[in-house]
Design a protein with these regions (language model features):
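Solvent-exposed alpha-helices and their adjacent loops that cap or buttress functional pockets
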Residues: 8-11, 112-114, 141-144, 174-178, ...
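Glycine/charged-rich beta-loop-alpha catalytic/anionic-binding loops adjacent to active sites
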Residues: 86-88, 110-122, 165-169, 266-273
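Phosphate/pyrophosphate-binding loops at sites that engage ATP/ADP/AMP, CoA/4′-phosphopantetheine
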Residues: 69-85, 226-244, 263
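Membrane helical hairpin/interfacial module
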Residues: 81-96
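Claisen-condensing/thiolase-fold acyl-transfer catalytic domains that form or cleave C-C bonds
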Residues: 67, 94-101, 115, 122-142, ...
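Condensing-enzyme catalytic core mediating Claisen C-C bond formation in acyl metabolism
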Residues: 1-62, 163-231, 310, 319-333
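Acidic-glycine-rich active-site phosphate/pyrophosphate-binding loop
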Residues: 39-44, 99-113, 151-163, 256-267
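Flexible, glycine-rich active-site loops centered on histidine and acidic residues
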Residues: 140-175
């Protein structure tokens, strides 16, 4: 196993808040509509056993779904386009073959009424890409002095034949990709934030050699995820027992659930219901799951959340702390 580490900043030095999580997903489509599953009953049952039932298929364009959820974020924050100092746009899968990324950026920002504003594009990190986008936004606040940075992560597949993907060359597919986008604002104004960003960690880790097996990949993935989880919790000064919920991304739930049991987490600590509805919406999963968990469970202020980005090569962990409970927000309004 080889991994690449980057220096991390202790949670205490992250005076950054996060607010206004919103998301867009496409229509929920049964996984048996995918021809390779419709014609393979054994594989179909394997996916159902791994909590996959449906995937999200977008009926709007990549920039439209990004702008849709970004506008929802602004509305939740009570903000206008002019309140945003910079934008970070993340893509993991670029399938708008008729457009250059620059044109897609214009298509997103023009829908939001944003002009003359710094924009950074972030890609490459796959299922951990939203963490890369968040890291860039945090640095823009801490280093460049911006106050409010809008983060948008958007992905869409035009070809249903590519929705199933294995974790190693020639391996049996392990997840079903869905279309969707997620957005939020990273802010220096902590008093207005929904969450405190306490810590983040992210590494590249892969198995070398031409004879890589699925067992090798699982071993590498497990070690990498355990590493970033442990370091993020240490940076945040948070014990496992203090974590209210683990927000998994929806890739290979069975493997990740087994991994987290090594830490002493139980099924009750996970929020994985969205896997049944959306499939694996790339790196947006954990924030979508966090949004829905807080909407349905109404956790109290001070609750800690562990968000996981678990991919084939990139792995990340975030620790957030809820600043205001649902009752607090209701009283404020």
């Amino acid at each position: 196993m080889q991994d690449t580490e980057h220096s991390t900043i202790p949670g205490a030095s992250l005076p950054i808040g996060l607010r206004g999580i919103a998301y867009y997903v496409g229509s929920s489509v049964p996984i048996q509509e995918l021809s390779c599953l419709a014609n393979n009953a054994e594989l179909l049952e394997r996916f159902k056993a791994a909590h996959f039932r449906n995937f999200s298929r977008s009926d709007i364009s990549l920039p439209e779904q990004a702008a849709h959820c970004a506008q929802a974020t602004l509305n939740k924050c009570g903000m206008q386009a002019g309140d945003i100092d910079a934008v970070v746009i993340g893509f993991s899968e670029l399938r708008e073959w008729t457009s250059y990324p620059e044109q897609l950026t214009y298509a997103i920002l023009s829908r939001l009424g944003m002009n003359h504003i710094p924009v950074v594009g972030v890609t490459l990190a796959g299922c951990a890409n939203v963490t890369s986008s968040l890291r860039v936004a945090r640095n823009m606040i801490m280093v460049d002095g911006y106050r409010n940075v809008l983060v948008v992560e958007t992905n869409l597949l035009r070809d249903d034949r590519r929705r199933l993907e294995g974790t190693a060359p020639g391996a049996t597919p392990e997840n079903v990709f869905g279309d969707g986008a997620v957005s939020f604002v990273l802010t220096r104004d902590n008093d207005t934030a929904d969450f405190d960003l306490l810590a983040m960690d992210q590494i590249v880790s892969y198995t070398e050699g031409e004879q890589t097996t699925i067992q090798d990949v699982i071993a590498t993935s497990t070690a990498a995820s355990r590493r970033v989880i442990g370091r993020a919790l240490d940076q945040a000064g948070v014990q496992r027992e203090q974590v209210k919920c683990v927000l998994l991304n929806n890739m290979n739930i069975l493997m990740m659930a087994a991994l987290f049991r090594l830490y002493g987490f139980t099924h009750a600590d996970f929020h994985i219901e969205n896997t049944l509805r959306y499939g694996h919406v790339w790196s947006a999963d954990s924030f979508i799951n966090l949004h829905d968990y807080c909407e349905t469970r109404k956790p109290l202020a001070g609750a800690h959340f562990l968000l996981i980005g678990h991919g084939n090569t990139y792995y990340s962990a975030l620790v957030l702390r809820l600043r205001h409970s649902a009752s607090d927000a209701a009283q404020a309004n």
